């Protein structure tokens, strides 16, 4: 284990003793607000300290087993004990590193996932449909619930734009690094010469705000327009003005929904998306300020960042941020995204660990 990690863990062990003492004091117990704050910190540190105690115990087990290696009768058992303890130490160190990393409270939230067709015309819209299928299949594997919030279909199938809401455990934390430009290289269905075309879509993953964030939008800052819902190619599918478009005047951010026959429900969904987009704008601005100080490996999640290429002739997916290449594109398009998302999380955790090391006193 790295020295700085061990020092940080020792500080947590010391802090746990301090918290135990504080929680035993009558003046703390009589102040419920302070008691709850200290109790929350105590619960968080107890988990870290418990895993660290187990880590030190397994280190001691290895030292004890090493002393038995000189005994022919005990050597085989000692080697087995050392191997088992070393394997557990690796796992414990990974757990401890993750526990020490800063937590983003938004990671546990539900999310809105937006896909927009970009360069490439009809082929881009078809690829947007393929991405939607990929993400919904992954959500099924993860046990998450998906619902379409708004969609604008293209004439040949696919989507000019589609927004879905995903509900489940740790949705935003798992999908947040999908934001950016997704490029596809393949022979389009409309191509008669067999030539490979390149087109692109943009994806944005937005944490769903809680109600306290949503109600902070001033109604006076909103312009709400209603219109008739329409299908592919502009064909009207509803004779009433049930579709809703909401504009946040100070920022110019727009959200619309026409998925439901009820104007009231469409308005509620559009407000949810609008709130998420406003929150994401604030998050992006903060990320841009951070990026001015350091260039993150994963990137800011801006739509303009080209993050990934899907090469169908080669069956290849490449994530350009972490130089990850996988030759299992068909499986990935069917929702097998786990390897990609795990690699992105590992890269981000490595970044955070380096930041933690540089921020701690020597």
UniProtKB/Swiss-Prot annotation:
The modification N5-methylglutamine is found at residue 235. GO terms for cellular component: cytoplasm. PROSITE patterns: RF_PROK_I. GO terms for molecular function: translation release factor activity, codon specific. It holds the Pfam family PCRF. Methylated by PrmC. Methylation increases the termination efficiency of RF1. SMART domains: PCRF. The keyword Magnesium does not apply. Keywords: Cytoplasm, Methylation, Protein biosynthesis. The keyword Flavoprotein does not apply. It is found in: Cytoplasm. Its main location: cytoplasm. InterPro entries: PCRF, Pep_chain_release_fac_I, Pep_chain_release_fac_I_sf, Prokaryotic/Mito_RF, RF-1. Peptide chain release factor 1 directs the termination of translation in response to the peptide chain termination codons UAG and UAA. Belongs to the prokaryotic/mitochondrial release factor family. This is Peptide chain release factor 1. It comes from Variovorax paradoxus (strain S110). The gene is prfA.
